Amino acid sequence: MYKTKCLREKLVLFLKIFFPILIYQFANYSASFVDTAMTGQYNTMDLAGVSMATSIWNPFFTFLTGIVSALVPIIGHHLGRGKKEEVASDFYQFIYLALGLSVVLLGLVVFLAPPVLNHIGLEAPVAAVAVRYLWFLSIGIIPLLLFSVIRSLLDSLGLTKLSMYLMLLLLPLNSGFNYLLIFGAFGVPELGGAGAGLGTSLAYWVLLGISILVLFKQEKLKALHLEKRIPLNMDKIKEGVRLGLPIGGTVFAEVAIFSVVGLIMAKFSSLIIASHQSAMNFSSLMYAFPMSISSAMAIVVSYEVGAKQFDDAKTYIGLGRWTALIFAAFTLSFLYIFRGNVASLYGNDPEFIDLTARFLTYSLFFQLADTFAAPLQGILRGYKDTVIPFYLGLVGYWGVTLPVAMVFDSLTDFGAYSYWIGLIISLIVSGVLYRWRLTVIMKRFESRKA
Protein backbone atom coordinates (compact mmCIF):
# COMPACT_ATOMS: atom_id res chain seq x y z
CA MET A 1 0.00 0.00 0.00
CA TYR A 2 1.07 3.57 -0.65
CA LYS A 3 -0.50 7.02 -0.64
CA THR A 4 -2.22 8.22 -3.81
CA LYS A 5 -2.87 11.77 -4.97
CA CYS A 6 -5.58 11.58 -7.63
CA LEU A 7 -8.46 9.42 -8.85
CA ARG A 8 -6.37 7.80 -11.59
CA GLU A 9 -3.69 6.71 -9.11
CA LYS A 10 -6.37 5.32 -6.81
CA LEU A 11 -7.97 3.36 -9.64
CA VAL A 12 -4.61 1.90 -10.70
CA LEU A 13 -3.74 0.90 -7.12
CA PHE A 14 -7.19 -0.55 -6.48
CA LEU A 15 -7.05 -2.69 -9.62
CA LYS A 16 -3.50 -3.80 -8.79
CA ILE A 17 -4.82 -5.09 -5.48
CA PHE A 18 -8.15 -6.38 -6.81
CA PHE A 19 -7.09 -8.51 -9.80
CA PRO A 20 -4.61 -10.72 -7.92
CA ILE A 21 -7.21 -11.18 -5.16
CA LEU A 22 -9.77 -12.14 -7.80
CA ILE A 23 -7.49 -14.79 -9.28
CA TYR A 24 -6.64 -15.92 -5.75
CA GLN A 25 -10.33 -16.26 -4.86
CA PHE A 26 -11.04 -18.21 -8.04
CA ALA A 27 -8.21 -20.57 -7.15
CA ASN A 28 -9.52 -20.79 -3.59
CA TYR A 29 -13.06 -21.64 -4.64
CA SER A 30 -11.67 -23.99 -7.27
CA ALA A 31 -10.86 -26.52 -4.53
CA SER A 32 -14.55 -26.96 -3.78
CA PHE A 33 -15.41 -26.73 -7.49
CA VAL A 34 -12.90 -29.44 -8.39
CA ASP A 35 -14.11 -31.69 -5.55
CA THR A 36 -17.73 -31.34 -6.64
CA ALA A 37 -17.19 -31.56 -10.41
CA MET A 38 -14.82 -34.54 -10.26
CA THR A 39 -17.04 -36.38 -7.78
CA GLY A 40 -20.03 -35.72 -10.05
CA GLN A 41 -18.17 -37.42 -12.89
CA TYR A 42 -17.61 -40.42 -10.57
CA ASN A 43 -21.31 -40.89 -9.70
CA THR A 44 -24.35 -38.96 -8.45
CA MET A 45 -24.56 -40.83 -5.13
CA ASP A 46 -21.03 -39.80 -4.12
CA LEU A 47 -21.76 -36.25 -5.29
CA ALA A 48 -24.76 -36.12 -2.94
CA GLY A 49 -22.54 -37.33 -0.07
CA VAL A 50 -19.86 -34.71 -0.73
CA SER A 51 -22.64 -32.10 -0.99
CA MET A 52 -23.97 -32.93 2.46
CA ALA A 53 -20.47 -32.97 3.94
CA THR A 54 -19.60 -29.54 2.56
CA SER A 55 -22.87 -28.19 3.97
CA ILE A 56 -21.48 -29.00 7.42
CA TRP A 57 -17.84 -28.12 6.73
CA ASN A 58 -18.22 -24.73 5.05
CA PRO A 59 -19.88 -22.74 7.87
CA PHE A 60 -17.32 -23.73 10.49
CA PHE A 61 -14.31 -23.35 8.24
CA THR A 62 -15.39 -19.95 6.93
CA PHE A 63 -16.15 -18.86 10.50
CA LEU A 64 -12.56 -19.58 11.55
CA THR A 65 -10.97 -18.12 8.41
CA GLY A 66 -13.15 -15.06 9.00
CA ILE A 67 -11.64 -14.70 12.46
CA VAL A 68 -8.04 -14.82 11.22
CA SER A 69 -8.88 -12.38 8.38
CA ALA A 70 -9.01 -9.69 11.10
CA LEU A 71 -5.25 -9.51 10.60
CA VAL A 72 -5.86 -7.48 7.39
CA PRO A 73 -7.45 -4.35 8.96
CA ILE A 74 -5.13 -4.58 11.99
CA ILE A 75 -2.01 -4.45 9.80
CA GLY A 76 -3.67 -1.93 7.48
CA HIS A 77 -4.12 0.50 10.36
CA HIS A 78 -0.49 -0.08 11.48
CA LEU A 79 0.79 0.76 8.01
CA GLY A 80 -1.47 3.79 7.68
CA ARG A 81 -0.03 5.13 10.94
CA GLY A 82 3.56 4.33 9.92
CA LYS A 83 4.02 1.59 12.57
CA LYS A 84 5.47 -1.19 10.42
CA GLU A 85 7.38 -2.61 13.39
CA GLU A 86 4.10 -3.86 14.87
CA VAL A 87 3.36 -6.16 11.93
CA ALA A 88 5.51 -9.16 12.92
CA SER A 89 4.07 -9.32 16.43
CA ASP A 90 0.48 -9.41 15.20
CA PHE A 91 1.38 -11.98 12.54
CA TYR A 92 2.74 -14.40 15.12
CA GLN A 93 -0.24 -13.92 17.43
CA PHE A 94 -2.55 -14.89 14.58
CA ILE A 95 -0.40 -17.96 13.87
CA TYR A 96 -0.94 -19.06 17.48
CA LEU A 97 -4.63 -18.23 17.20
CA ALA A 98 -4.95 -20.29 13.99
CA LEU A 99 -3.35 -23.32 15.65
CA GLY A 100 -5.81 -23.11 18.54
CA LEU A 101 -8.76 -22.71 16.20
CA SER A 102 -7.57 -25.73 14.19
CA VAL A 103 -7.95 -27.92 17.26
CA VAL A 104 -11.49 -26.59 17.81
CA LEU A 105 -12.54 -27.30 14.23
CA LEU A 106 -10.95 -30.75 14.30
CA GLY A 107 -12.99 -31.63 17.39
CA LEU A 108 -16.21 -30.41 15.77
CA VAL A 109 -15.61 -32.45 12.63
CA VAL A 110 -14.61 -35.67 14.39
CA PHE A 111 -17.22 -35.70 17.16
CA LEU A 112 -20.24 -33.77 15.86
CA ALA A 113 -20.38 -34.31 12.10
CA PRO A 114 -21.07 -38.10 12.03
CA PRO A 115 -24.12 -37.95 14.38
CA VAL A 116 -25.61 -35.08 12.39
CA LEU A 117 -25.13 -36.79 9.03
CA ASN A 118 -26.54 -40.07 10.31
CA HIS A 119 -29.72 -38.49 11.69
CA ILE A 120 -31.01 -36.19 8.94
CA GLY A 121 -32.64 -38.86 6.80
CA LEU A 122 -29.89 -39.44 4.25
CA GLU A 123 -29.65 -42.67 2.34
CA ALA A 124 -27.03 -44.87 4.04
CA PRO A 125 -24.49 -44.83 1.15
CA VAL A 126 -24.74 -41.02 0.91
CA ALA A 127 -24.16 -40.61 4.67
CA ALA A 128 -21.16 -42.97 4.54
CA VAL A 129 -19.49 -40.95 1.77
CA ALA A 130 -20.15 -37.70 3.65
CA VAL A 131 -18.59 -38.94 6.90
CA ARG A 132 -15.47 -40.30 5.20
CA TYR A 133 -15.06 -37.10 3.15
CA LEU A 134 -15.12 -34.99 6.33
CA TRP A 135 -12.65 -37.21 8.14
CA PHE A 136 -10.20 -36.98 5.25
CA LEU A 137 -10.77 -33.22 4.93
CA SER A 138 -10.00 -32.74 8.64
CA ILE A 139 -6.40 -33.82 7.95
CA GLY A 140 -5.95 -30.49 6.18
CA ILE A 141 -7.43 -28.20 8.84
CA ILE A 142 -4.07 -26.96 10.18
CA PRO A 143 -2.53 -25.99 6.80
CA LEU A 144 -5.82 -24.43 5.68
CA LEU A 145 -5.90 -21.99 8.60
CA LEU A 146 -2.15 -21.31 8.70
CA PHE A 147 -2.17 -20.49 5.01
CA SER A 148 -5.11 -18.15 5.63
CA VAL A 149 -2.94 -16.20 8.11
CA ILE A 150 -0.02 -16.02 5.67
CA ARG A 151 -2.35 -14.87 2.91
CA SER A 152 -3.84 -12.18 5.18
CA LEU A 153 -0.33 -10.88 5.93
CA LEU A 154 0.59 -10.71 2.25
CA ASP A 155 -2.70 -9.05 1.27
CA SER A 156 -2.48 -6.41 4.00
CA LEU A 157 1.03 -5.50 2.80
CA GLY A 158 -0.32 -5.07 -0.73
CA LEU A 159 1.50 -8.21 -1.95
CA THR A 160 -1.66 -9.64 -3.46
CA LYS A 161 0.22 -10.93 -6.53
CA LEU A 162 2.26 -13.18 -4.27
CA SER A 163 -0.93 -14.55 -2.69
CA MET A 164 -2.25 -15.13 -6.18
CA TYR A 165 0.81 -17.05 -7.37
CA LEU A 166 0.74 -19.27 -4.29
CA MET A 167 -2.97 -19.98 -4.61
CA LEU A 168 -2.66 -20.80 -8.30
CA LEU A 169 -0.65 -23.84 -7.24
CA LEU A 170 -3.73 -25.23 -5.49
CA LEU A 171 -5.70 -26.07 -8.63
CA PRO A 172 -3.17 -28.45 -10.24
CA LEU A 173 -2.27 -29.95 -6.86
CA ASN A 174 -5.89 -30.54 -5.91
CA SER A 175 -6.88 -31.85 -9.33
CA GLY A 176 -3.94 -34.24 -9.44
CA PHE A 177 -4.50 -35.68 -5.97
CA ASN A 178 -8.25 -35.93 -6.61
CA TYR A 179 -7.76 -37.84 -9.85
CA LEU A 180 -5.53 -40.35 -8.10
CA LEU A 181 -7.74 -40.80 -5.03
CA ILE A 182 -11.27 -40.56 -6.45
CA PHE A 183 -10.74 -42.84 -9.45
CA GLY A 184 -7.88 -44.98 -8.10
CA ALA A 185 -5.42 -44.16 -10.88
CA PHE A 186 -1.93 -45.68 -11.10
CA GLY A 187 -2.60 -48.30 -8.45
CA VAL A 188 -3.75 -45.83 -5.77
CA PRO A 189 -6.79 -47.10 -3.78
CA GLU A 190 -10.10 -45.95 -5.31
CA LEU A 191 -11.82 -43.87 -2.60
CA GLY A 192 -14.63 -42.32 -4.62
CA GLY A 193 -16.10 -39.06 -3.32
CA ALA A 194 -14.27 -39.40 0.00
CA GLY A 195 -10.98 -39.24 -1.90
CA ALA A 196 -11.77 -35.63 -2.84
CA GLY A 197 -11.45 -34.70 0.84
CA LEU A 198 -8.05 -36.36 1.15
CA GLY A 199 -6.90 -34.80 -2.13
CA THR A 200 -7.76 -31.31 -0.88
CA SER A 201 -5.98 -31.91 2.44
CA LEU A 202 -2.79 -33.13 0.76
CA ALA A 203 -2.86 -30.16 -1.63
CA TYR A 204 -3.04 -27.69 1.27
CA TRP A 205 -0.16 -29.35 3.14
CA VAL A 206 2.04 -28.96 0.06
CA LEU A 207 0.84 -25.36 -0.40
CA LEU A 208 1.64 -24.49 3.22
CA GLY A 209 5.19 -25.84 2.88
CA ILE A 210 5.80 -23.76 -0.24
CA SER A 211 4.26 -20.67 1.41
CA ILE A 212 6.56 -20.91 4.43
CA LEU A 213 9.61 -21.10 2.16
CA VAL A 214 8.42 -18.04 0.22
CA LEU A 215 7.66 -16.15 3.44
CA PHE A 216 11.26 -16.34 4.63
CA LYS A 217 12.91 -15.94 1.22
CA GLN A 218 10.88 -12.99 -0.13
CA GLU A 219 13.04 -9.85 -0.15
CA LYS A 220 10.11 -7.49 0.52
CA LEU A 221 9.32 -9.31 3.77
CA LYS A 222 12.81 -9.37 5.25
CA ALA A 223 12.35 -5.91 6.78
CA LEU A 224 9.62 -7.38 9.01
CA HIS A 225 12.13 -9.77 10.65
CA LEU A 226 9.70 -12.68 10.68
CA GLU A 227 12.58 -15.04 11.42
CA LYS A 228 12.52 -13.79 15.02
CA ARG A 229 9.77 -15.79 16.68
CA ILE A 230 7.65 -13.63 18.98
CA PRO A 231 6.12 -15.24 22.09
CA LEU A 232 2.42 -15.45 22.85
CA ASN A 233 0.85 -12.12 23.79
CA MET A 234 -2.61 -12.62 25.25
CA ASP A 235 -3.52 -8.93 24.93
CA LYS A 236 -2.95 -9.05 21.17
CA ILE A 237 -4.74 -12.41 20.94
CA LYS A 238 -7.74 -10.87 22.70
CA GLU A 239 -7.68 -7.88 20.33
CA GLY A 240 -7.59 -10.25 17.36
CA VAL A 241 -10.48 -12.30 18.71
CA ARG A 242 -12.45 -9.15 19.60
CA LEU A 243 -12.16 -7.88 16.04
CA GLY A 244 -12.20 -11.26 14.28
CA LEU A 245 -15.06 -12.95 16.09
CA PRO A 246 -17.73 -10.64 14.63
CA ILE A 247 -16.13 -10.96 11.17
CA GLY A 248 -16.18 -14.74 11.45
CA GLY A 249 -19.68 -14.60 12.91
CA THR A 250 -20.96 -12.52 10.00
CA VAL A 251 -19.48 -14.92 7.46
CA PHE A 252 -20.79 -17.87 9.50
CA ALA A 253 -24.30 -16.40 9.59
CA GLU A 254 -24.32 -16.16 5.80
CA VAL A 255 -22.63 -19.46 4.96
CA ALA A 256 -24.46 -21.43 7.66
CA ILE A 257 -27.89 -20.49 6.36
CA PHE A 258 -26.84 -21.76 2.93
CA SER A 259 -25.65 -24.96 4.58
CA VAL A 260 -28.87 -25.36 6.56
CA VAL A 261 -30.75 -25.09 3.28
CA GLY A 262 -28.41 -27.74 1.89
CA LEU A 263 -29.22 -30.04 4.81
CA ILE A 264 -32.96 -29.40 4.39
CA MET A 265 -32.52 -30.67 0.83
CA ALA A 266 -32.02 -34.11 2.40
CA LYS A 267 -35.82 -34.49 2.37
CA PHE A 268 -35.75 -34.44 -1.43
CA SER A 269 -34.31 -37.07 -3.78
CA SER A 270 -30.59 -37.67 -4.33
CA LEU A 271 -30.99 -36.13 -7.80
CA ILE A 272 -32.34 -32.86 -6.35
CA ILE A 273 -29.61 -32.85 -3.68
CA ALA A 274 -26.91 -33.28 -6.34
CA SER A 275 -28.43 -30.63 -8.64
CA HIS A 276 -28.87 -28.15 -5.80
CA GLN A 277 -25.27 -28.59 -4.66
CA SER A 278 -23.87 -28.36 -8.18
CA ALA A 279 -25.69 -25.07 -8.82
CA MET A 280 -24.71 -23.77 -5.39
CA ASN A 281 -21.11 -24.82 -6.01
CA PHE A 282 -20.88 -22.82 -9.25
CA SER A 283 -22.63 -19.88 -7.57
CA SER A 284 -19.87 -19.97 -4.94
CA LEU A 285 -17.28 -19.85 -7.71
CA MET A 286 -18.98 -16.77 -9.18
CA TYR A 287 -19.08 -15.25 -5.68
CA ALA A 288 -15.32 -14.81 -6.10
CA PHE A 289 -16.04 -11.53 -7.93
CA PRO A 290 -17.92 -9.63 -5.17
CA MET A 291 -15.81 -11.37 -2.50
CA SER A 292 -12.63 -10.06 -4.14
CA ILE A 293 -14.07 -6.55 -4.25
CA SER A 294 -14.87 -6.92 -0.55
CA SER A 295 -11.32 -8.03 0.32
CA ALA A 296 -9.75 -5.24 -1.74
CA MET A 297 -12.03 -2.68 -0.10
CA ALA A 298 -10.99 -3.86 3.38
CA ILE A 299 -7.32 -3.33 2.45
CA VAL A 300 -7.55 0.13 0.87
CA VAL A 301 -10.17 1.53 3.26
CA SER A 302 -8.33 0.34 6.38
CA TYR A 303 -5.13 1.99 5.12
CA GLU A 304 -6.81 5.35 4.44
CA VAL A 305 -8.80 5.28 7.69
CA GLY A 306 -5.60 4.44 9.60
CA ALA A 307 -3.98 7.47 7.95
CA LYS A 308 -7.10 9.55 8.76
CA GLN A 309 -7.64 10.25 5.05
CA PHE A 310 -11.42 9.81 5.19
CA ASP A 311 -12.13 11.53 1.85
CA ASP A 312 -9.72 9.14 0.13
CA ALA A 313 -11.50 6.22 1.79
CA LYS A 314 -14.80 7.52 0.40
CA THR A 315 -13.30 7.70 -3.10
CA TYR A 316 -12.18 4.08 -2.89
CA ILE A 317 -15.69 3.09 -1.78
CA GLY A 318 -17.14 4.55 -4.97
CA LEU A 319 -14.49 2.88 -7.14
CA GLY A 320 -15.10 -0.49 -5.53
CA ARG A 321 -18.86 -0.45 -5.89
CA TRP A 322 -18.73 0.60 -9.56
CA THR A 323 -16.18 -2.15 -10.25
CA ALA A 324 -18.54 -4.67 -8.65
CA LEU A 325 -21.42 -3.57 -10.89
CA ILE A 326 -19.34 -3.78 -14.07
CA PHE A 327 -18.15 -7.30 -13.29
CA ALA A 328 -21.68 -8.36 -12.33
CA ALA A 329 -22.94 -7.39 -15.78
CA PHE A 330 -20.43 -9.77 -17.38
CA THR A 331 -20.86 -12.69 -14.97
CA LEU A 332 -24.66 -12.58 -15.02
CA SER A 333 -24.72 -12.51 -18.82
CA PHE A 334 -22.27 -15.41 -19.01
CA LEU A 335 -24.21 -17.62 -16.62
CA TYR A 336 -27.59 -16.90 -18.20
CA ILE A 337 -26.34 -17.78 -21.69
CA PHE A 338 -24.25 -20.83 -20.73
CA ARG A 339 -26.20 -22.25 -17.77
CA GLY A 340 -26.85 -25.52 -19.62
CA ASN A 341 -23.17 -25.92 -20.46
CA VAL A 342 -22.22 -25.20 -16.86
CA ALA A 343 -24.67 -27.84 -15.62
CA SER A 344 -23.08 -30.44 -17.90
CA LEU A 345 -19.73 -29.94 -16.14
CA TYR A 346 -21.15 -31.71 -13.09
CA GLY A 347 -22.74 -34.76 -14.73
CA ASN A 348 -23.99 -36.42 -17.89
CA ASP A 349 -27.57 -37.39 -17.02
CA PRO A 350 -30.05 -35.25 -19.06
CA GLU A 351 -32.53 -34.95 -16.17
CA PHE A 352 -29.71 -33.87 -13.84
CA ILE A 353 -28.47 -31.26 -16.34
CA ASP A 354 -31.97 -29.82 -16.83
CA LEU A 355 -32.64 -29.57 -13.09
CA THR A 356 -29.22 -28.03 -12.37
CA ALA A 357 -29.75 -25.43 -15.11
CA ARG A 358 -33.01 -24.39 -13.42
CA PHE A 359 -31.25 -23.93 -10.09
CA LEU A 360 -28.56 -21.89 -11.88
CA THR A 361 -31.27 -19.53 -13.15
CA TYR A 362 -32.16 -18.74 -9.53
CA SER A 363 -28.47 -18.23 -8.76
CA LEU A 364 -28.47 -15.21 -11.09
CA PHE A 365 -30.43 -13.34 -8.43
CA PHE A 366 -27.93 -14.50 -5.76
CA GLN A 367 -25.12 -12.87 -7.65
CA LEU A 368 -27.03 -9.64 -8.18
CA ALA A 369 -27.73 -9.37 -4.44
CA ASP A 370 -24.11 -10.28 -3.57
CA THR A 371 -22.86 -7.53 -5.87
CA PHE A 372 -24.64 -5.06 -3.60
CA ALA A 373 -23.99 -6.63 -0.17
CA ALA A 374 -20.48 -8.15 -0.28
CA PRO A 375 -18.47 -4.95 -0.98
CA LEU A 376 -20.28 -3.25 1.91
CA GLN A 377 -18.97 -5.93 4.30
CA GLY A 378 -15.38 -5.25 3.24
CA ILE A 379 -15.84 -1.50 3.57
CA LEU A 380 -17.18 -1.85 7.11
CA ARG A 381 -14.22 -4.08 8.05
CA GLY A 382 -11.91 -1.39 6.72
CA TYR A 383 -13.46 0.97 9.28
CA LYS A 384 -12.94 -1.76 11.93
CA ASP A 385 -16.71 -1.91 12.34
CA THR A 386 -17.49 -5.58 12.85
CA VAL A 387 -19.85 -6.05 15.81
CA ILE A 388 -23.00 -4.31 14.54
CA PRO A 389 -22.65 -5.83 11.04
CA PHE A 390 -22.56 -9.24 12.72
CA TYR A 391 -25.96 -8.64 14.32
CA LEU A 392 -27.32 -7.17 11.10
CA GLY A 393 -26.19 -10.32 9.30
CA LEU A 394 -28.00 -12.49 11.83
CA VAL A 395 -31.21 -10.55 11.28
CA GLY A 396 -30.85 -10.49 7.51
CA TYR A 397 -29.89 -14.11 6.97
CA TRP A 398 -31.60 -16.03 9.77
CA GLY A 399 -34.60 -13.78 10.30
CA VAL A 400 -35.61 -13.91 6.65
CA THR A 401 -34.44 -17.05 4.83
CA LEU A 402 -36.23 -19.88 6.61
CA PRO A 403 -39.53 -18.06 7.34
CA VAL A 404 -39.84 -16.95 3.70
CA ALA A 405 -38.74 -20.35 2.38
CA MET A 406 -41.20 -22.25 4.56
CA VAL A 407 -44.08 -20.01 3.51
CA PHE A 408 -43.29 -20.62 -0.17
CA ASP A 409 -42.79 -24.36 0.43
CA SER A 410 -46.12 -24.66 2.27
CA LEU A 411 -48.32 -22.42 0.13
CA THR A 412 -46.91 -22.96 -3.37
CA ASP A 413 -45.62 -25.80 -5.54
CA PHE A 414 -42.10 -24.32 -5.83
CA GLY A 415 -40.70 -27.22 -3.77
CA ALA A 416 -36.90 -27.07 -3.46
CA TYR A 417 -36.82 -23.71 -5.24
CA SER A 418 -38.67 -22.17 -2.25
CA TYR A 419 -35.45 -22.24 -0.24
CA TRP A 420 -33.53 -20.46 -2.99
CA ILE A 421 -36.17 -17.73 -3.01
CA GLY A 422 -35.73 -17.35 0.76
CA LEU A 423 -31.96 -17.03 0.34
CA ILE A 424 -32.28 -14.41 -2.39
CA ILE A 425 -34.60 -12.22 -0.31
CA SER A 426 -32.33 -12.56 2.75
CA LEU A 427 -29.31 -11.35 0.75
CA ILE A 428 -31.25 -8.30 -0.43
CA VAL A 429 -32.37 -7.46 3.12
CA SER A 430 -28.81 -7.89 4.45
CA GLY A 431 -27.44 -5.58 1.78
CA VAL A 432 -29.94 -2.87 2.73
CA LEU A 433 -28.98 -3.21 6.40
CA TYR A 434 -25.24 -3.01 5.64
CA ARG A 435 -25.81 0.11 3.54
CA TRP A 436 -27.64 1.75 6.43
CA ARG A 437 -24.76 0.87 8.78
CA LEU A 438 -22.15 2.29 6.39
CA THR A 439 -24.07 5.57 6.23
CA VAL A 440 -23.98 5.78 10.04
CA ILE A 441 -20.26 4.98 10.23
CA MET A 442 -19.25 7.44 7.52
CA LYS A 443 -21.20 10.23 9.21
CA ARG A 444 -19.45 9.39 12.48
CA PHE A 445 -15.99 9.65 10.90
CA GLU A 446 -16.96 12.83 9.05
CA SER A 447 -17.89 14.43 12.38
CA ARG A 448 -14.47 13.48 13.79
CA LYS A 449 -12.77 15.16 10.84
CA ALA A 450 -14.76 18.32 11.47
Task: Tell me what each language-model feature is.
Residues 1-21, 75-142, 188-245, 301-366, ...:
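Short alpha-helical transmembrane segments in multi-pass integral membrane proteins
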